[in-house]
Each structure stands twice: as structure tokens, then as C-alpha cells.
Amino acid sequence: YLVKRYMTWPKSGFEENRSWFQHLAEMGQHPRAMVISCCDSRVQATAIFGAESGEFFIHRNIANLIPPFNPSGDHHGTSAAIEYAVTALKVAHILVLGHSGCGGIQHGYHTCNQTPGHGLEDTSFIKKWLDILNPAYDLLPDEGTDEEKIATLEKRSVVVSLQNLMGFPFVQEAIEADRLT
């Protein structure tokens, strides 16, 4: 089905926007904002904000997380995307786009509280990634249902990601120079 959709793409908007796509191809990308979004197939940042091609530099990962700054550690994909957006593309804004019903956050919640049947091996890439949630999980209240705690974790994970973002020196420098919000 992917090949079929690809073959019909030129007829579904490409032809009427050919000059814009030509401009993007020749001039390169100059996005105004970076969006760090969940890789959940239901979350489409360009559709949510009505963005055009070339407007956003988008990085997607499980649960829209930003790891702590750690040049000698793991998670270089997200860190490299942030560095590229800030230092090479000079984006003016970074948005962490959290969402409700996030399967990654739900999985992270059950992994953090060691819910039977939801555990991951220490060698799991998913577990290592979702360990970024630990500081947000540790702040959850003791009272409430699992569903309420997961909804709170969805919000707190964005806060932790923004705090982690502020630990990147090039992000701090761009903010201090009024080039980034």
C-alpha cells in the first residue's frame, strides 16, 4: 500500500505546489520551529498546527522525551537532532508536543512501578529510553488510580523534558542570546 500511495502523491497536491517544492529543494530547509513529538501514529504535528512543508523540523521518539545532556552517554539521536536544530538550522522555537493516551508513557509508568507482566529486560532499548521518565514518575502522588497517575505522568514528562532541554549548553546559549524560545 505504501508504493501505491507514493505513486499517487504527485496527483494529490504536488502538482499544484510544484513551485513551492522546487523552492524548498533549491533553497534548503529553514524551519522556524523544532517539534519534538511522540512517534505515536495518531500524533501529526503538521496537521495539528496547520504547518506547511519546510515550516517545522520534527523529531519523533517514544513518549516525546528529551534525555538529559550527556555527550558520553546514550540517546544521541534526540540529542543530535536538538543540536542540529539549534546550531545549524537556527530554529527560533522548540516545542515538546505531549499528548494524552500515550502508550509510551503508559508503558513507562508500568515499567517504573514494576507492574507484573510489564517489565522489560535491562538490555531493552525501550527500558533504557523510558528510564528518562524516572524523575517524573518519582514525583507522582501516592493516591489516585493508575489511570490518573498516567495522565499526570503525561504532563510531568513534558516538564522533565523541558528541564532536560535546558541542560544542553547550546540551548542555554541560544536562549540567552534571544535566538530561541
Predicted regions and their residues:
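Divalent-metal-activated hydrolytic enzyme cores
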Residues: Y1-P31, N64-A80, Y84-A92, G103-T181
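Conserved H-X4-D acyltransferase segment
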Residues: G28-T46
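Short beta-strand segments
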Residues: I36-C38, R60, L95-H99
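Catalytic core of membrane glycerolipid acyltransferases/transacylases, capturing the structured
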Residues: S41-L65
